[in-house]
Amino acid sequence: MNIRPLGDRVVIKRVEAEETTKSGIVLPGAAKEKPQVAEVIAVGPGGLVDGKEVKMELKVGDKVLFSKYAGNEVKIEGEEVTILKQDDILAVVEG
C-alpha cells in the first residue's frame, strides 16, 4: 500500500477481532465489535500543527490502542484503513 499521510496524521489498519468468545460462542461478522487495536502502516512527518511543533512518536509497525470514534475510515487498494491524528492514539501496545 502506497500512502503518505500529511502533518500529524497516522494511517492504521485494525487488527482482526476474535471470532469466538471465551465461552466458545462463534460470532457472526455483524455481531463482532470493531477492534480498537491496530497496526501503524504509515506516519506523517509531523511539523507545525496549529502553530505548535509536533514530533511524531509512532513508527510503522507499532501496535496501538486508539479512540473508538476517531479518524476517517477509507478503502485504499481494497484494504480498509483509518486515517487519524496522532492525538487520537491512546497508547502503544508493547510485548
From Swiss-Prot:
Name of the protein this chain belongs to: Co-chaperonin GroES
NCBIfam families, A to Z: PRK00364.1-2, PRK00364.2-2, PRK00364.2-4
GO molecular function, one term: protein folding chaperone
Function in brief: Together with the chaperonin GroEL, plays an essential role in assisting protein folding. The GroEL-GroES system forms a nano-cage that allows encapsulation of the non-native substrate proteins and provides a physical environment optimized to promote and accelerate protein folding. GroES binds to the apical surface of the GroEL ring, thereby capping the opening of the GroEL channel.
Entry keyword Chaperone: yes
One GO term describing the cellular component: cytoplasm
Keyword Cytoplasm (UniProt): yes
Cross-referenced PANTHER family: 10 KDA HEAT SHOCK PROTEIN (PTHR10772), CO-CHAPERONIN GROES (PTHR10772:SF58)
Chief site of localization: cytoplasm
CDD domains documented for this protein: cpn10
Signal peptide: none
Summary of subunit composition and partner proteins: Heptamer of 7 subunits arranged in a ring. Interacts with the chaperonin GroEL.
